[in-house]
């Protein structure tokens, strides 16, 4: 049976990736481009929509090959988290603004 995509609700039998791990993955993808001398737009900021688009396409195209290895688990397939990665790649705010938005949403609608 193929693995289910992560819904971030814990039922996918796959450890969810943290935002830090996803950011590290983005950095490693950019480092791979640099290592292969494919340096066009590697210094682009995520909010620079036009320049960063090439980096986003590279990440999307290679999600099936990426694996995050940490002390938690050695076989966390990144492709299971493609929706979360797409959302993070699509954020059009600086992270401080996004953090404030998420925190205010969570604390506005407390569920615990």
Swiss-Prot record:
InterPro entries: Baculo_LEF-11
UniProt xrefs under Pfam families: Baculo_LEF-11
Single Gene Ontology BP annotation: regulation of DNA-templated transcription
Source organism superkingdom: Viruses
Keywords for the protein's UniProt record, in alphabetical order: Transcription, Transcription regulation
Function: Involved in late/very late gene activation.
Family listed: Belongs to the baculoviridae LEF-11 family.
Name of this chain's protein: Late expression factor 11
Organism: Bombyx mori nuclear polyhedrosis virus
């Amino acid at each position: 049976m193929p693995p289910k995509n992560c819904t971030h609700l814990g039922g996918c039998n796959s450890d969810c990736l943290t935002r830090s791990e996803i950011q590290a993955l983005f950095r490693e993808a950019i480092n791979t481009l640099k290592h292969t001398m494919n340096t066009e737009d590697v210094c682009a900021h995520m909010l620079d929509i036009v320049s960063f688009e090439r980096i986003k396409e590279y990440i999307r195209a290679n999600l099936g090959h990426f694996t995050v290895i940490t002390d938690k688990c050695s076989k966390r397939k990144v492709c299971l988290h493609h929706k979360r990665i797409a959302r993070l790649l699509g954020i059009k705010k600086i992270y401080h603004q996004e953090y404030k938005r998420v925190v205010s949403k969570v604390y506005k609608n407390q569920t615990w």
